[in-house]
Amino acid sequence: MKLKSGSMVKIRNKINDIEPYVPGRSIKEIADAYGLKEDEIIKLGSNENPLGPSPAAVEAMERELESVHRYPESALTDLREAIADYAGVGMDQVIVGGDGADEIIDVLGRTFLEPGESFVVPMPSYMYYEYTLQAHDARAVHARWDVNENRLDLESVLDAVDESTRLVFLCTPNNPTGGLIDKKDIRAVLESTDTLVVVDEAYTEFAGVDNTDLLPDHENLFILRTFSKVMGLAGMRIGYGLGDPQIIEYMHRVKPVFSLTRLSHAAALATIRDRDYIKKSTEYSIKSREYLYSGLKKFPELRVFRSYANYILIDVRGTGRTAAELSEELLRKGIIVRDCTSFTGLDEYWIRVSVGTLEEDRRFLEVLGELVQ
C-alpha cells in the first residue's frame, strides 16, 4: 500500500479487507448535526443503564483521583475475588479486561487463533466478534440465528464447526434479537467439539441467564461478561471472562498488563459489591423493557420481538420506511435508536431500541406514534 505521501509503509494485507467498525453517534454529534440541545436528546441506541452508575462507584472514583499519577494494579486480586464471589467461581477462573468485553474477545483471538483458522458466529449477533478477530487473520464462519423464531439454529452451529474451528460464539440473550439460547443447546455444542465455546452473557442479569454451572464439567467453556450494562459503567470500559483456570492462565500471558485504569478498577470493585444497586438496576430495566414492549405492541405497523435483555428488536417495514429512514426521523426529534442494517443476517428494515427511564420510554412512544400512525 502506498500512503498519500508516497511512502511505501507496509500495511498488513488483511487490514485492507476490514471495514472500520462504526459505533453509534454520540449525543454531542447528534446535537450539533440537528441543532438540538444535548439535554433534550434521548439515547436509546447503545443498551446502557438508564439510571446511571452506582453512587458507591462515583465515590470510589473520587477517592482514587489523587492516585492517578501511579500505575494501576496488574493482578487485580481484590476485583477478581469480588467477581468470583459474584459469579460463584474461583478467583483463578476470572480474567478482567480494560476495554470492556471487547478486550477479552481480542485476547481470545491472540490466545487461540492462528492465521487462516476460523471462528463460528450465528448471525445476526454481536458484530464485534467478527470485527476484532478478522484482524488476527482469522476466518469468520456464519451459522444461523432464526430471526423469525428468535432462537438459535443449533444444527447450523454443529454443521459449521470443522477441523479449522478454534472458537464458537454463542450470545445469550442474543444481541440484537434479545432471544435466549437453551442450556441444553449450549451443552450440545460443548459436547460436540473440543473447540472453545464462548458464551456471551453481557445481558445475563436481565434474563436470569447463568451457565456457570456448566464450567466444572466443560473445560472448553468460556463465559464472557461486562460491567457496561446492568453495572452502569459503559464509559469506564470493564469486562471479564470466566473459564477453566488453565485457559485463564494462558490468556493472562497475552493480555495487556495495565489495561484497567485506577478509576475503572475502583468503580468496578465498588459496583460489584453494591448488590442493592445491581438489584435495583435490574428490576428497573426489566420494568422499562416490559413497558416499552407493551407500548410497541399497540402499533400494527410494527413487528416487535420478545426480549430478555435491555433492548427490543423491531421490524419496521410495515411503516413504509427503512430503518435508516425511520431512525433519521427520530434523530430529528432528538431520539437515538440503533439502525440494524449493518448486522449480518438482517435486512434494511430493523431497528433496536434500548430501555430508557420510563419518561424517556413514554416520549419515544409518543414521537413514534406521531411519525408512523
UniProtKB/Swiss-Prot annotation:
Record's catalysed reaction(s): L-histidinol phosphate + 2-oxoglutarate = 3-(imidazol-4-yl)-2-oxopropyl phosphate + L-glutamate
Keywords: Amino-acid biosynthesis, Aminotransferase, Histidine biosynthesis, Pyridoxal phosphate, Transferase
Keyword hit for Amino-acid biosynthesis: yes
One Pfam family per UniProt: Aminotran_1_2
EC number: 2.6.1.9
Pathway: Amino-acid biosynthesis; L-histidine biosynthesis; L-histidine from 5-phospho-alpha-D-ribose 1-diphosphate: step 7/9
Necessary cofactors: pyridoxal 5'-phosphate
Family annotation (SUPFAM superfamilies): PLP-dependent transferases
Modified sites of kind N6-(pyridoxal phosphate)lysine: 229
Biological processes, Gene Ontology terms: L-histidine biosynthetic process
UniProt xrefs under InterPro entries: Aminotransferase_I/II_large, HisP_aminotrans, PyrdxlP-dep_Trfase, PyrdxlP-dep_Trfase_major, PyrdxlP-dep_Trfase_small
PANTHER family tied to this protein: HISTIDINOL-PHOSPHATE AMINOTRANSFERASE, HISTIDINOL-PHOSPHATE AMINOTRANSFERASE-RELATED
Family named by the database record: Belongs to the class-II pyridoxal-phosphate-dependent aminotransferase family. Histidinol-phosphate aminotransferase subfamily.
Entry protein name: Histidinol-phosphate aminotransferase
Organism: Methanothermobacter thermautotrophicus (strain ATCC 29096 / DSM 1053 / JCM 10044 / NBRC 100330 / Delta H) (Methanobacterium thermoautotrophicum)
